[in-house]
Design a protein with these regions (language model features):
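Positively charged n-region of N-terminal signal peptides that target proteins for export
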Residues: 1-4
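Bacterial N-terminal signal peptides
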Residues: 6-16
Length: 151
């Protein structure tokens, strides 16, 4: 009887350990990584107020939808970045949806301290134009669970 209980305990411990292991992360496809890197470079340029880099990264026919639903264009976006973003603005949890070999949506979450709402879901559409990735469209959606946060 003792042997059976010991064997059963060993099986249970082994099964528990096996199930508690987190699965290894899947490698990010090269296409997705390229777009995530492009998105991060764009956000870093915006934080650093590198307006020349920001301007180059945005397509001339860019359109965006603001948190309140208003439409805006390239000039509005570049002008808004002149004021700067809080230095502790964070972007995380990047996901890429490939549309074609030359276009994709990069969705991610963003925290902008001091802004209302400070928690946002971002969706940026990138297109390869003349061999360069450029931002064509952006939609900003407030994170509903935090839309009324006053900070």
């Amino acid at each position: 009887m003792r042997g059976i209980l010991l064997a059963l305990a060993t099986v249970l411990v082994s099964a528990t350990l096996a199930l508690s292991q987190t699965p290894s992360s899947k490698p990010v496809p090269a296409f997705d990584q390229q777009l995530i890197d492009q998105q991060k470079q764009f956000l870093e340029a915006a934080l650093a107020k590198n307006l020349a880099a920001v301007d180059r990264a945005i397509a001339s026919d860019f359109q965006g939808i603001e948190i309140n639903g208003d439409l805006y264009g390239k000039a509005d976006l570049v002008d808004s970045l002149q004021a700067g973003m809080p230095p502790d603005t964070r972007a995380y949890d990047f996901h890429v949806v490939k549309l074609t070999d030359a276009s994709a949506v990069v969705a991610y979450n963003q925290i902008v301290p001091g802004a209302n709402p400070r928690y946002r879901h971002m969706a940026d559409t990138w297109a390869k134009i003349d061999g360069q990735w450029q931002l064509k469209f952006r939609q900003i959606t407030p994170n509903l669970w935090s839309a009324t946060d006053l900070d």
